[in-house]
Amino acid sequence: METSFVQTTMALGLSSKKASSRNVAVERKNLITVCRFSVKTLLEKYTAEPIDDSSEEFVNFAAILEQILSHRFKACAPAGPVSWFSSDGQRGFWDYIRLACSKVPNNCVSSIENMENISTARAKGRAWIRVALMEKRMSEYITTALRDTRTTRRFYDSGAIMLRDEATILTGMLIGLSAIDFSFCLKGEVLDGKTPVVIDYTPYLKFTQSYDYLTDEEERHSAESSTSEDNSPEHPYLPLVTDEDSWYSKWHKMEQKFRIVYAQKGYLEELVRLRESQLKDLEAENRRLQLQLEEAAAQNQREKRELEGVILELQEQLTGLIPSDHAPLAQGSKELTTPLVNQWPSLGTLNGAEGASNSKLYRRHSFMSTEPLSAEASLSSDSQRLGEGTRDEEPWGPIGKDPTPSMLGLCGSLASIPSCKSLASFKSNECLVSDSPEGSPALSPS
């Protein structure tokens, strides 16, 4: 018993779900069909004059579009069931538009948010519909919103038009509205959000009478009765319009279609001219940026060469400031450019002193290092040659041969190793010189 009851309940639930999904599908189809009729009516009505709020066709179209955007909206859904043509609970689609259309470049969302006379979400949604139509960007807004599938699923329940393929059909229909000029005043009772949205279906209802139910006898009876003088009613199956009227109506429809296509052609041409001007501006900007890039590259090359020259100059200056290992040798060679013999006192001066027996202590010049002197200093032996012989009565002097063996190191060149002693033997700082006439003065290291 319980099993059968559960099965019955499940069957009823499945049937109710199927009925609900079928009703939702019917709602989608009806709304899209009515929207197609409304757009077609607007295109047929449009002439050179812009369409405003006084147009019944626009009022009906705005109501239909608001119903489509509010179809199965989650935000303010009431607790009880709501019919698909009702607007009591279908509110708040502006919250979805505000988030989903914020990525549209140069959008009107912020300007609508800052309007002082519009406070409710419904009023802002209606204002957005009018502004988007005046901007001729309604299809662009809807397309951008549909791309944000995450936000769309967040605001709409399953089965909504914005989540089905009918949304793509809607964007295709809204493209044709770009050829129409709209002019609206964003003030008044229409935008206060309190007036309910009502769709008028009478312009889209078409009554077509069928004559299939008439039998042959009835047709003959009607034909016979039409010949009588007393009874001459107009038969319902007879054509009410002549061929001329039918041709005129066809011509009128073709003219309207031509005007619509011509208006769309003008809009597309204007759009192409706008895109061409934008392309030219972008090309000019690209050329200007390319020139700036080339100038910057040339300037960078010049600065690089200048910096390389500065680096080389600084390296030369740094090389001149760093002391080399042979600097003491060069300084020593400069000090010893004069012969070393001239640095010693003359022997004649010693002979002319107060007494011959008095010995004097002479200090030799001290050198910081004898090894550099032995390597770099040179004495000209040819210019300081002494004479071959000397007399006992003549004082010792630079002229003549010096018989003193200890003074041989001062003759000749220090650079010639075979002809002189090494200066390494002169490491002592003092030597005694005796000017006694008995013998040659001797130098002995102390």
Swiss-Prot record:
The keyword Transcription regulation does not apply. Keywords: Coiled coil, Phosphoprotein. It comes from the Eukaryota. The modification Phosphothreonine is found at residue 215. SUPFAM superfamilies: RUN domain-like (SSF140741). The modification Phosphoserine is found at residues 232, 416, 419. Interacts with the GTP-bound form of RAP2A. This is RUN domain-containing protein 3A. It comes from Pongo abelii (Sumatran orangutan). The gene is RUNDC3A.
